[in-house]
Amino acid sequence: WELVKNLKKGKAVFSQPPMPIKCAGAPQKAMYLSCDHWFKEGVLNDINVEFYNTGAVLFGVKEYVPALMEYVKKYNAALNFEHQLVKVDGKAKVASFKNVANPEAPLVETEFDMLHAVPPQSPPDFIKVSPLVDSDGWIDVDQSTLQHKAFANIFALGDAINAPNAKTAA
């Protein structure tokens, strides 16, 4: 929040890592809330806002996209899809993004005055090393019953299971 409040001009870069993350909308919420603050402070016109999303679309639920695009337009945010943050040089203030649609393409490097980076997320280590997980490290449950696929006396729920839902409490 201090970075947002203190930024009066320059470039603000926001990134969204590949799924799963606990809340697919959180990286965008950070951008919209920051932009709204800058808009109300009268400095948004002096800030270049860029959003880099590893995914190919703004949001996975297409019915929400038109409303979100209104905010993107209001805040004049540049959208960059299929770009994953892979490196940050904090001293030089440069963020590097891989084009996931074309992995052979050179990295896209962009300077920033403020960077909001959401780290990739995974299950806790104590879960990943247990015998309860699938090949990706998530607790392996039947998505309809939440019963473990190998251990009938185990049920699991929450953001450590391999169900395809967003890992969020929202």
Residue positions per predicted region:
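Glycine-rich dinucleotide-binding loop and its adjacent helix/turn
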Residues: 1-43, 143-144
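FAD-site-proximal beta/loop scaffold in flavoenzymes
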Residues: 1-8, 111-170
